[in-house]
């Protein structure tokens, strides 16, 4: 499972349960209280963060998440309100 899949799964759970849910991003893992994803060695999360999904499944808290490896930076642009996500890959200089 990847970040995008866990993001969408958390979004679906919040919509199905009609309850707010949090996706917690920490140095070594990402979790939503039901599922947990280990961040592989060699990938760094820019900072510990929490994404809150409202009961309609929309992201109501955070605009971007950034991961980096030795070779590239992967940034996720999270659109507030509608819960859409866009992946942007950039080579490191």
Regions found by a protein language model. Name each.
Residues 5, 12-93:
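N-terminal helix-rich module
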């Amino acid at each position: 499972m990847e970040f995008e899949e866990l993001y969408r799964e958390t979004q679906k759970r919040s919509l199905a349960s009609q309850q707010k849910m949090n996706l917690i991003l920490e140095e070594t893992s990402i979790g939503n209280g039901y599922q947990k994803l280990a961040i592989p060695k060699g990938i760094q999360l820019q900072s510990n963060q929490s994404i809150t999904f409202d009961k309609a499944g929309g992201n109501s808290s955070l605009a971007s998440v950034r991961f980096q490896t030795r070779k590239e930076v992967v940034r996720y642009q999270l659109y507030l309100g509608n819960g859409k996500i866009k992946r942007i890959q950039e080579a490191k200089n």
